[in-house]
Amino acid sequence: MALQTLQSSWVTFRKILSHFPEELSLAFVYGSGVYRQAGPSSDQKNAMLDFVFTVDDPVAWHSKNLKKNWSHYSFLKVLGPKIITSIQNNYGAGVYYNSLIMCNGRLIKYGVISTNVLIEDLLNWNNLYIAGRLQKPVKIISVNEDVTLRSALDRNLKSAVTAAFLMLPESFSEEDLFIEIAGLSYSGDFRMVVGEDKTKVLNIVKPNIAHFRELYGSILQENPQVVYKSQQGWLEIDKSPEGQFTQLMTLPKTLQQQINHIMDPPGKNRDVEETLFQVAHDPDCGDVVRLGLSAIVRPSSIRQSTKGIFTAGKSFGNPCVTYLLTEWLPHSWLQCKALYLLGACEMLSFDGHKLGYCSKVQTGITAAEPGGRTMSDHWQCCWKLYCPSEFSETLPVCRVFPSYCFIYQSYRCIGLQKQQHLCSPSSSPSLRQLLPSVLVGYFCCYCHFSKW
């Protein structure tokens, strides 16, 4: 059964890849749609698939992709492939994401990054963004024979082990190590404060110990500074100042520079090696390394998420939005207790008004009417429809509060007014048609949040 599932997933990934230009030096898919994660939102079958495409020539690749998949891009597509590539390379973490795409029956997002930018990130941890993704188990779909890229991928894993060693005690378990490694790219990530599940790292590691072991096993076996008892799942490392100095000297260049910046007193201007020697003798060496990681991750995560406001989301046709339904108010609004609806691509109706087209609808809703009577059974009945061609159920509600959502760093508000064709499978509305609804949505959300 496991082999059959693996083969089925591989076929799915390859079919999705066939929808894009072929000139890829590396393509991989990651996240909860590929590897199971613990936690309440762990529906792997319906989870979004997250792809990253590495390309040698981003301008040429975006040019071809715009011809094949024009609807995947935000309004920035009208500026052309050169501007898109400039935004990709010069803002955020060097990656351009198109999100909320229905492809081959699955909801996906995909990021595009230059091969040179990726190699720099893997070797030096300039942003620790895609490099951080590649420190956790991913499914590589295709990779070319570029020796430099393959060497950088291996170097990134070894650097992750070294950084984790510096933040761990003298002896620890495999799980402790993998939790530290998985958390490297989340150190200082502002999304862990404002949006992400605080147990995200644990949810990634615990169900996937075997995958982490497969990724790092040979590196641990060959590392001269660790005693790896693989049968017991236990490790011991050299925590002497000499051992820590050796490890600090092999860290990626950007992390070394950040540590130097943190520890170098004003006016001293010590070189990096001198600072690292001091840190190696410091009892708080691990905390200093963690601060250095935060200094890399925090700004890159903020820049990338800010860029995502402009790059994420395709054209207004064929939308996928998560709706947060508000508490019941005197004028007949519906309560959903902060749980979510996710719809993508076949007709979805609210109060008789066509809102979108949804081929898959996923719920975990407990709705309530005044007086406390729940209507979850009826709600589930209305939404438990997965037929791709006939979806005509109308939800039994009067009005829905304007939607607001954070989906994979994309943010969008739409006021649910009497918009007869917010989208259709064959055409997208003009900006003039949609703009009043969008403005009403932003205004209502502003009023709602100002009240609180």
Curated annotation (Swiss-Prot):
Transmembrane segments: none annotated. InterPro entries: Tam41 (IPR015222). It is an enzyme of class 2 (transferase). It is found in: Mitochondrion inner membrane. Changing residue 137 to L: In COXPD56; uncertain significance; contrary to wild-type, unable to complement the growth defect in deficient yeast. Changing residue 110 to C: In COXPD56; uncertain significance; contrary to wild-type, unable to complement the growth defect in deficient yeast. GO terms for cellular component: mitochondrial inner membrane; mitochondrion. It catalyses: a 1,2-diacyl-sn-glycero-3-phosphate + CTP + H(+) = a CDP-1,2-diacyl-sn-glycerol + diphosphate. One of its GO terms (biological process) is CDP-diacylglycerol biosynthetic process. Its cofactor is Mg(2+). One of its GO terms (molecular function) is phosphatidate cytidylyltransferase activity. Its EC number is 2.7.7.41. Keywords: Lipid biosynthesis, Lipid metabolism, Magnesium, Membrane, Mitochondrion, Mitochondrion inner membrane, Nucleotidyltransferase, Phospholipid biosynthesis, Phospholipid metabolism, Primary mitochondrial disease, Transferase. It is a peripheral membrane protein. Pathway: Phospholipid metabolism; CDP-diacylglycerol biosynthesis; CDP-diacylglycerol from sn-glycerol 3-phosphate: step 3/3. Belongs to the TAM41 family. It is linked to Combined oxidative phosphorylation deficiency 56: An autosomal recessive mitochondrial disease characterized by lethargy at birth, hypotonia, developmental delay, myopathy, and ptosis. Catalyzes the conversion of phosphatidic acid (PA) to CDP-diacylglycerol (CDP-DAG), an essential intermediate in the synthesis of phosphatidylglycerol, cardiolipin and phosphatidylinositol. This is Phosphatidate cytidylyltransferase, mitochondrial. It comes from Homo sapiens.
